[in-house]
């Protein structure tokens, strides 16, 4: 009986919970972009395990994920099967991962002042759009 309990415990300790897998992110950024590092730090502070990949050209990543030029940010994040463009706050990414909507991803177009990684004071609400359709996903 003890062997069965120990075996079950060992098996459970090796399993990775779904939420932990979803919190792993890859952030693709242009070489030398400091605001992208700031956004990665924001995500880490909110429980994400972020791997940063510096590229000379982000266009192939954006093309791979079908990111429209009007929604392109200075960096592209792959997380939980979704694409996140730009300085989207972690709490909105959390919502995306929790709700699992049938969309490709989300974008915070432009580089709004006060958004995570950008610095400065927030001067207006952030409107986060569904990638492609442009429909509002969240306002923060």
Regions found by a protein language model. Name each.
Residues 40-60:
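Conserved helix-turn-beta segment immediately C-terminal to the redox Cys motif
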Residues 1-2:
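N-terminal secretory signal peptides that target proteins for export/translocation
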Residues 32, 39, 54-57, 89-93:
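Stable alpha-helical elements in mature extracytoplasmic
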Residues 5-15:
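Bacterial N-terminal signal peptides
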Residues 16-20:
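Sec/Tat signal peptide C-region and signal peptidase I cleavage site
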Residues 24-25, 47-50, 80-83:
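Short active-site oxyanion
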Residues 64-140:
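Thiol/selenol-based redox catalytic cores and closely related redox-interacting motifs
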Residues 21-46:
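Local sequence-structure signature of Cys/Sec-based thiol-disulfide redox active-site neighborhoods
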């Amino acid at each position: 009986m003890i062997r069965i309990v120990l075996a079950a415990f060992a098996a459970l300790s090796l399993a990775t919970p779904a939420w932990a897998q979803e919190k792993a992110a890859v952030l693709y950024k242009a070489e030398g972009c400091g605001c992208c590092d700031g956004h990665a730090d924001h995500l880490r502070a909110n429980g994400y395990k972020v791997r940063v990949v510096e590229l000379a050209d982000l266009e192939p990543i954006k093309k791979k994920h079908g990111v429209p030029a009007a929604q392109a940010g200075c960096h592209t994040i792959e997380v939980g099967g979704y694409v996140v463009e730009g300085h989207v706050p972690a709490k909105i990414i959390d919502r995306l991962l929790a709700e699992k909507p049938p969309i490709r991803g989300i974008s915070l177009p432009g580089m709004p002042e006060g958004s995570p990684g950008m610095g400065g004071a927030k001067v207006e609400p952030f409107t986060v759009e569904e990638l492609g359709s442009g429909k509002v996903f969240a306002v923060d």
